[in-house]
């Protein structure tokens, strides 16, 4: 007998209300054939490779920290194209359109020779090499699960993981790192227990340390021994770009495109000193439930009677540094960005996040600290010389910018307002100034006691949305040129795109080159 049964599977229905769709900038941005070349000065920075150097009282910074393993975040400020006095006023209609910049080309120049830098710690927590052990490391006489000795730290150095990377966008790059989390109220966090950790997202600022082989973590909050990593990150937070978050950003402003090259290998294998926080499951758990599951204890009288520490870790190496695998000093062209923003520089600014430790040489500077000339020294005495370390970096940035138009249509303005309402304020849409009165009151000594108080509410300046964040500000408001063929990146752009210079109504533009080939004749037999 056939009977009706309710369906066991799920039925998926379309949403009852239409879902808002974010348009790509290519759908409403109108590109012109006017290109500009922008370039920066030679950008130099000098400092100590491992830490900040302060005066004796510690209240004045004398030498900043400049490490090859730091992020360099350049904030490029561009001029407002709507304020340009264009020779050809037919380029756009200010009543119906606004002008914006689009990035079409980029070259990040790096000076200084290639070199490998080393980092380390004079009190590094490594007990012994565990790759080629020739004797079992015994514990001290304090009992089980104690440190190998009171102090096992050694002076150790190594080269970091090799990394070359840059991220281009119109907002700061989003980074990720692991940090200490707040424990639940019901869980009593006892002293000495491992705290909970969580993944956090923050902007990558200029000077933030990159991952050098120990992970992206807040070492200041999660390593109280101050001896598990090198000096340059022991009191820092190492960040790594959150590519997954930026790739799924609905607007795609943080990352138009990026280039990345990382490499490392485990050079040495060590074991930590100190008490073991998490014991290996054995006979001490549940009356022997896990006995002989992970190890079989040693016999009495043997060094293996007391199990050793299992806190293994490697020190990585970046290996060979070669000019054959360089991401810098070469042009990159943006044809299609990974997100909805295809290179449009909203708010007339651009963020370039760079990491490059292939030029990681640290200078050693020795200074004679005694009175008298150096030629009078008879015998070498190390106490008569002071040793200093410095690290230098050299950058130069070149851009190819394209002038674009934004139509002031309702659907376009609605999306821009949802994305960033401050853009519409900068464009002064709907602002109608009141007519000036023919007579204005102007006091000469407005700050004196004889006159009235000045205005208590002066007009507020526009607040920086990234106030409190540290970037390397580069002003390009007066560094633009229409003569692309006068610059290296401009000539490369004209050549690779098959373009040539033209002049229309006094405004320089570029156009595609036409073919000069004649019609091929058919050969007679």
Curated annotation (Swiss-Prot):
What this chain does, per the record? Forms an icosahedral capsid with a T=7 symmetry and a 50 nm diameter. The capsid is composed of 72 pentamers linked to each other by disulfide bonds and associated with L2 proteins. Binds to heparan sulfate proteoglycans on cell surface of basal layer keratinocytes to provide initial virion attachment. This binding mediates a conformational change in the virus capsid that facilitates efficient infection. The virion enters the host cell via endocytosis. During virus trafficking, L1 protein dissociates from the viral DNA and the genomic DNA is released to the host nucleus.
Biological processes, Gene Ontology terms: endocytosis involved in viral entry into host cell; virion attachment to host cell
Listed A to Z, the keywords are: Capsid protein, Disulfide bond, Host nucleus, Host-virus interaction, Late protein, T=7 icosahedral capsid protein, Viral attachment to host cell, Viral penetration into host cytoplasm, Virion, Virus endocytosis by host, Virus entry into host cell
Origin species, per record, is Human papillomavirus type 5b
Q: Is Disulfide bond one of the keywords?
A: yes
Protein's recorded name: Major capsid protein L1
Q: Which domain of life is it from?
A: Viruses
Recorded GO molecular functions are:
structural molecule activity
Q: Where is the protein found, in the record's own terms?
A: Virion; Host nucleus
Show the SUPFAM superfamilies listed in the entry: Group I dsDNA viruses
- Which Gene3D superfamilies does the protein's record reference? Major capsid L1 (late) superfamily, Papillomavirus
| Oligomeric and partner information | Self-assembles into homopentamers. The capsid has an icosahedral symmetry and consists of 72 capsomers, with each capsomer being a pentamer of L1. Interacts with the minor capsid protein L2; this interaction is necessary for viral genome encapsidation. Interacts with protein E2; this interaction enhances E2-dependent replication and transcription activation.
Cellular component terms, GO, for this chain's entry?
host cell nucleus; T=7 icosahedral viral capsid
Q: Which family does it belong to?
A: Belongs to the papillomaviridae L1 protein family.
